[in-house]
């Protein structure tokens, strides 16, 4: 139940170069998204853009990197919960991993998905839809908001 969520998870999905990092880097700096407690940012993919670590420190954001899908486990998340004691979690999810797998994962006690956001590069959307439709549909099935960028 949503009422039982102590630590909301904001799950940001999208294929490589879809604008996830830019979107999150901007959002984490905004007053409307500010909180007093700690934000745990879990990066599951390294794109072209990078986070400004000094700015992240100013927003009390700590970063954990998970490079391999098999390393994203309930045990690893539970360890992060103990180490960081976050007030919220933001996940930049790897676009080649099934979102449904994460949605079905056992999460640490009190954690729950609050919002799913999918970033889409409008210049490559048709190519991904034509060649990776099942992966894209899995990505957007439960998304709350789709952000299209690079629109012409």
Placement of each model-derived feature along the sequence:
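Well-ordered beta-strand positions
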Residues: 115, 144-145
């Amino acid at each position: 139940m949503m009422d039982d969520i102590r630590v909301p998870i904001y799950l940001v999905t999208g294929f490589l170069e879809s604008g996830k990092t830019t979107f999150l880097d901007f959002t984490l700096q905004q007053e409307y998204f500010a909180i007093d407690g700690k934000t745990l940012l879990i990066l599951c993919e390294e794109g072209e853009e990078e986070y400004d670590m000094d700015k992240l420190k100013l927003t009390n954001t700590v970063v954990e990197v998970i490079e391999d899908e098999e390393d994203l486990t309930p045990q690893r998340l539970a360890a992060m919960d103990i180490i960081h004691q976050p007030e919220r979690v933001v996940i930049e999810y790897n676009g080649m991993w099934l979102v449904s797998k994460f949605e079905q994962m056992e999460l640490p006690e009190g954690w729950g998905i609050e919002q799913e956001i999918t970033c889409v590069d409008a210049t490559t959307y048709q190519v991904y839809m034509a060649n990776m439709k099942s992966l894209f549909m899995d990505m957007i099935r439960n998304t709350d908001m789709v952000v299209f960028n690079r629109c012409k």
